[in-house]
């Protein structure tokens, strides 16, 4: 336990907060050609690579991912949620934060139904998370 005098001399050290999605906290000023500290909920980017990867130990699957170069110049790995996708190299996508627990290094999700990414076809429940439109009512 510190004395009052020790606290006056040194003070308490501030806890540093480390972001879980650091690429969303950086902007880019193309006029000055420098990085800026502008946080945003989503960012646009271009796919440089689309592929599959296998998850960590107890799980087994082929998870779809895309390597995305963001508008701020940072390149990140993003997960493609849902069944089936239409992404390929040079597709323009929107990414949001949110890691995939069983894929190391994947800290971002691609937003389905935004920009070049199509929504999941034939999805009836949880449609808003996958960019699926409401199905037309059946005619009698």
UniProtKB/Swiss-Prot annotation:
Protein family per UniProt: Belongs to the universal ribosomal protein uS12 family.
Record protein name field: Small ribosomal subunit protein uS12
Alphabetized UniProt keyword annotations: Methylation, Ribonucleoprotein, Ribosomal protein, RNA-binding, rRNA-binding, tRNA-binding
GO annotation (BP), single: translation
Residues with PTM 3-methylthioaspartic acid: 102
Statement: the UniProt record of this protein carries the keyword Translocase: no
Signal peptide: none
Entries under InterPro entries matching the protein: NA-bd_OB-fold (IPR012340), Ribosomal_uS12 (IPR006032), Ribosomal_uS12_bac (IPR005679)
Subunit structure: Part of the 30S ribosomal subunit. Contacts proteins S8 and S17. May interact with IF1 in the 30S initiation complex.
GO MF, one example: rRNA binding
Region (Disordered): 33-55
Cellular component aspect of the GO annotation: small ribosomal subunit
Pfam families given in the database record: Ribosom_S12_S23
PANTHER family the UniProt entry points to: 30S RIBOSOMAL PROTEIN S12 FAMILY MEMBER (PTHR11652)
UniProt function note: With S4 and S5 plays an important role in translational accuracy. Interacts with and stabilizes bases of the 16S rRNA that are involved in tRNA selection in the A site and with the mRNA backbone. Located at the interface of the 30S and 50S subunits, it traverses the body of the 30S subunit contacting proteins on the other side and probably holding the rRNA structure together. The combined cluster of proteins S8, S12 and S17 appears to hold together the shoulder and platform of the 30S subunit.
Gene name tied to this protein: rpsL
Residue ranges of coiled coil: none
Claim: Ribosomal protein is one of the keywords in the record: yes
């Amino acid at each position: 336990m510190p004395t009052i005098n020790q606290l006056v001399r040194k003070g308490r050290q501030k806890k540093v907060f480390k972001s879980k999605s650091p690429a969303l906290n950086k902007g880019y000023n193309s006029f000055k050609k420098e990085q800026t500290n502008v946080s945003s909920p989503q960012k646009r980017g271009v796919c440089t690579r689309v592929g599959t990867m296998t998850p960590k130990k107890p799980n087994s699957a082929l998870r779809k991912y895309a390597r995305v170069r963001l508008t701020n110049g940072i390149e990140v790995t993003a997960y493609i949620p849902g069944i089936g996708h239409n992404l390929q190299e040079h597709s323009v996508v929107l990414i949001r934060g949110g890691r995939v627990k069983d894929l190391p290094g994947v800290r971002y999700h691609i937003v389905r139904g935004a920009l070049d990414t199509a929504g999941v076809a034939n999805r009836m429940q949880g449609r808003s998370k996958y960019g699926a439109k409401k199905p037309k009512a059946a005619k009698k």
